Design a protein with these regions (language model features):
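A structural signal for well-ordered alpha-helical scaffolds and beta->alpha junctions
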Residues: 58, 62, 116-120, 187, ...
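Intrinsically disordered, low-complexity intracellular terminal segments
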Residues: 168-182, 200, 212-296, 308-315, ...
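Juxta-kinase regulatory segment immediately upstream of eukaryotic protein kinase catalytic domains
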Residues: 2-77
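Canonical protein kinase catalytic loop motif
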Residues: 296-302
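Active-site flanking residues adjacent to catalytic metal/cofactor-binding acidic residues
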Residues: 101, 298, 317
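Alpha-helical structural context
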Residues: 67-68, 129, 413
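ATP-binding pocket architecture of kinase catalytic cores
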Residues: 75-273, 292-295, 311
Length: 416
């Protein structure tokens, strides 16, 4: 079985426990949309969507490959449309290898030029400066006759990490959820492979916040961070005067805490202001706030990790929303242990937290099994940081910081 470099849709929808609950949760999420903007975007995307599959478009893609690779090429079925990108499989006749031309979808993805430039630089940086396995990047450009594009080597794989973790009883059309019957040994083994990947990603340090830019063979943090949240920006429409007031106050208080530097210390040994700090014995010091940042990817999740027939990772895909970020983000346990978002869990955040906490124990055991790289110089084991992040609520703070769609739900639930 071969997997092309593809994405599952990961906008506001997310995995649900059953199809009915999924429909209800998605409907509630859509009620928060700006319907005028949604309609206009939909109409523009419908026109662009049709153009992606025209013969003339495919000929332009093949011609682009021939010019870059300096050999004849042909399109290979079939074109794959993901959540943010369209992928054209192409065979270079001279060398006989398959590549993929990956382009951000027009009228669906924002900041297409920046996104492609930054993703190309990130893949190149990881290939040169980490042990993370990424697709081989032949070429990338933010502007060409066909628009922003990358040429990547086609990746042969058996399945994705999401396939390995998901409930096999789900219908193909249903959005995936972690298999509730998965054997603990299998879960720990698969989690361990993801732990190793995150440790490899944690090792390189960067000097400031922003996106990587490549000039020649040199990389630097010189662009603004293009986040997933920017692509699906929440405009915070309000339902009533009370709703408007509550949202304003929540954001004002959040801004005030950030201005005082409290958010950086929250959930760490230096935290002397929060309610949690009075009841918990925290042992992990906060990371340095200057000249020590980590590469973070908003879209790093099991769906984008390809495995071979031994379930070894052959490639981590889709680095489009990757940027140098506060190290705190990397010291939280990953949200995707259950393969779905907490704010859209049909039984509510409390139930999500209970199920998540049980799986987090397995994740922490898997993390403790992994060896640290020489580049990680922290006073405590990484698993200790992850554990204290969950216990203190730092997990929720950072999650709400990155996701404006979830901010109000989380702030109301965890105001302390």
């Amino acid at each position: 079985m071969l997997h092309v470099l593809s994405l599952a849709y990961h906008g506001v929808t997310c995995p649900m426990s059953n199809s009915t609950a999924s429909s209800v949760a998605v409907t509630k999420a859509q009620q928060r949309f700006d319907h005028l903007a949604w309609t206009l975007n939909g109409e523009a995307w419908e026109k662009s969507y049709k153009r992606l599959f025209l013969k003339s478009t495919c000929h332009q893609v093949v011609s682009f490959v021939e010019n870059v690779c300096d050999q004849t090429a042909s399109l290979v079925p079939s074109i794959t449309l993901g959540g943010h990108n369209v992928l054209y499989p192409v065979r270079c006749d001279g060398d006989g290898f398959d590549i993929v031309v990956r382009q951000p979808c027009p009228d669906l993805v924002q900041f297409r030029e920046e996104k492609t430039r930054d993703e190309g630089a990130t893949i190149s940086y990881l290939a040169q400066n980490s042990a993370v396995r990424v697709p081989e990047l032949f070429f990338h450009t933010s502007s060409s006759r066909i628009g922003p594009a990358m040429i990547l080597l086609f990746i042969k794989s058996e399945r994705s990490m999401s396939d390995a973790l998901a409930d096999p009883g789900k219908d193909p059309g249903e959005i995936r959820v972690l298999d509730p019957e998965i054997h603990e040994e299998d879960l720990r083994r698969l989690y361990g492979k993801m732990c190793r990947l995150l440790i490899q990603l944690f090792e390189p340090t960067l000097h400031t916040i922003g996106s990587l830019v490549e000039v020649g063979n040199n990389h630097s943090v010189a662009g603004r961070p293009i986040t997933h949240n920017m692509n699906d920006m929440h405009n915070d429409l309000v339902d009533s005067e009370d709703d408007c007031r509550n949202k304003y106050v929540a954001r004002y208080l959040f801004h005030l805490l950030a201005k005082k530097g409290h958010l950086s210390a929250f959930g760490f040994l230096e935290d002397n202001w929060s309610a949690q700090s009075q009841s918990l014995e925290l042992s992990c010091s906060m990371p340095c706030g200057t000249d020590s940042f980590r590469l973070w990817c908003d879209d790093l999740r099991p769906q984008n990790i390809l495995l071979d027939h031994h379930d070894n990772i052959v490639a981590a895909l889709d680095w489009e929303f990757a940027y140098s970020a506060p190290t705190q983000f990397s010291l939280d346990p990953p949200w995707w242990l259950l393969l779905q978002l907490p704010e859209l869990w049909p039984s509510g955040i409390d139930d999500w937290s209970q199920v998540y906490e049980a799986r987090l124990r397995t994740w922490l055991l898997a993390m403790e099994d992994e060896k640290w790289g020489e580049g990680i110089n922290f006073p405590a084991n990484l698993s200790t940081y992850l554990r204290e992040s969950w216990l203190s609520g730092r997990f929720w703070l950072d999650y709400a910081t990155r996701k404006s769609w979830a901010f109000d739900t989380i702030f109301r639930k965890y105001p302390e």
